[in-house]
């Protein structure tokens, strides 16, 4: 029986993970759950999964939740804030942490989990982009496995588990293209509602906007470089609208290994939870005759400048990816609040990167300071628009 703690259980990945676990009760159980402020969802999860501990952001909400647990005769410990997250990640009985808190805020809890020698199922690509070299070094020192949850990185992982990284010629990262890869109108007129209308995946608001700008694919390119120990120039992005080929790995002998399935996040989530085993699932079987065709296109870096910014940040390295990620988080939040235009996202990220003075220190504090600086600088740019 594998005991799992989910950080971000009220989000899209968290809820899908719980749905999977509810059908795998003989193999996996829930030890802990953490949410930001969605107490209503957390209460329903507590009733169903009976975790030993939970954590919420607000001290007041934590106190109210404690009272609710007592009144309902529920024996679940309730914690709060960053301290609560750290308690959840270090619980002795937990075997694996599923890190699904979006953005850089999830970084410290991942670090705490690794130091407590907990395996990590990583759904927080921003943490890897921000401080990936630090995370992977720490994981190696503590004998911790970092298992990807993103469909693309799960695919890469499945394509190269038994191969030496030195034999990889390139990683081919597929992208659906989002809602705008064929869009030929004025990008500055794109609305929030249009950006949130993804043709393939149902995801959270922030990642859906990132998919629309293709920044999500840029972040994933950096994540692939870090997770699989290859230089960014060996990571190639191609547009694949059907989202059936989730990624490919080409080796030095010319062989290309791909992972295919119908687009369903439950598959990579389940694989991360059960690795190295594979268990039956209710994923719709792949029927290539029914699909009929698989299309592939080169991405347009001019049309989607966030892709160029991501590759630039990866090539510069050090603190630049952290700065890019933080500026993007700020810009996307402002776009979702209808404060800036769709095209302003890339402009804000680009100006923040170009103003940043690179630090070559690899300490965790350096990455956190770069993130802090970038958020404040991006906010300044947003206020000037």
Swiss-Prot record:
Pfam families: DXP_redisom_C, DXP_reductoisom, DXPR_C. 1-deoxy-D-xylulose 5-phosphate binds at residues 125, 151-152, 176, 198, 211, 216-217, 220. It comes from the Bacteria. InterPro entries: DXP_reductoisomerase (IPR003821), DXP_reductoisomerase_C (IPR013644), DXP_reductoisomerase_N (IPR013512), DXPR_C (IPR026877), DXPR_C_sf (IPR036169), NAD(P)-bd_dom_sf (IPR036291). Mn(2+) binds at residues 150, 152, 220. Its cofactor is Mg(2+); Mn(2+). NADPH binds at residues 10-13, 36, 38, 124, 126, 204. HAMAP family: DXP_reductoisom (MF_00183). Belongs to the DXR family. PANTHER family: 1-DEOXY-D-XYLULOSE 5-PHOSPHATE REDUCTOISOMERASE, 1-DEOXY-D-XYLULOSE 5-PHOSPHATE REDUCTOISOMERASE, CHLOROPLASTIC. NCBIfam families: Dxr (TIGR00243), PRK12464.1 (NF009114). This is 1-deoxy-D-xylulose 5-phosphate reductoisomerase.
